[in-house]
Amino acid sequence: LTLGISLMRGGGPCRMIDKLPGRLPWSRALGLHARSEEIFDAMGVLEAVRRQSRAFQAIHVYGDRGREKGPLLTLPMGELPSPFPQLLCCPQPRIEAVLEERFRSLGGELWWNAELLDVQQDGSGVRATVLQRSEEHQGGEERHLQTELLVGADGAHSRVRETLGLPFAGNDYHESFLLADVDWNPDLENDAFHGFLLADGNLIAIPMPDAGWRLVVTEEPGEEAEPDMALFHERIREALGDQAPLPDEPRWLSRFTIQRRLVSHYRRNRILLAGDACHVQSPLGAQGMNTGIADAFNLAWKLVLFCRGHGGGALLDSYQRERRPVAEDMLRGVD
């Protein structure tokens, strides 16, 4: 959506396809850093996103005795050399809703229920075969799209990357994590991010824009039991004391594992990749969505100029030259 808006604003008409029937209601991504806020400001969507967000004043990191001895480390927000120094907490579905509205207002086309089956390219363009599902065609109807360029911003399991046969080298982390979105009223500041490095594992507590909280805990490697709130309750008591209030049933409860991977090439002739199709990493630091937003913003103006006959392949090559080192640094940082 960032790429689509930027292309439409630059006079480069585009069409987006997504095999999902619509936006997902849940998402792990929710942190927006200063650079993403600057990009959204340039795109004309920042104020709408801010209205859906909670601004964090600080990041607190506590040791193995929880809040008993106070934070080991506090990072005050507001000191970055940016017009938007605060970290914003805004769940990805809300961000996507704002971006989709902006994209459509600019005349952009978005096809839901449209799955990419195959893609071929030659010196003059790209031909994509898409399976379009609808109420009239439950089994789907094949459609063929001819385009000058194609960008795969289709996530960690990118069909575009797979079709190109590009290596996605890296490894899996051994730990697994539980994530819960809960109604909770702890004795914690609701304008700060809280991380607890506890003796038996970690706890992250993030206040959400709607007064709920997001909790994340580490699990023992190989845990396969159905996830529940028991481990969250243990970590909360360890972090905040035996008298701390405990959340009841979660709105959303999920287990996830983490990979660290980076694609070998961001471009193969007229087909390019962006975001999680290029790089996946630990969610610590909220880098994934932000790096993908910056990928798209960097790429968009290059595509517009290329389609107008400027820069040629050298201009498209500059995308990988500029963005892949950023991903390499980011992966080292979150490790």
Regions found by a protein language model. Name each.
Residues R50, E109-W111, A169, R251:
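General small-molecule cofactor/ligand-binding pocket signal
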Residues P25-L106, L117-Q120, M208:
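Active-site-adjacent segment of FAD-dependent monooxygenases/related oxidoreductases
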Residues W112-R127, S254:
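A conserved short coil-to-beta-strand element within the FAD-binding core of flavoproteins
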Residues Q138-L149, A153, R268:
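Core beta-strand elements of the Rossmann-like FAD/NAD(P) dinucleotide-binding domain
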Residues L1-G11, I17, L99, G152, ...:
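Conserved mid-domain beta->alpha element of the FAD-binding
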Residues L20:
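Residues in the short beta-alpha loop(s) of Rossmann-like NAD(P)-binding domains
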Residues K69-G70, G139-H144, N202:
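Short, mixed charged/polar active-site loops
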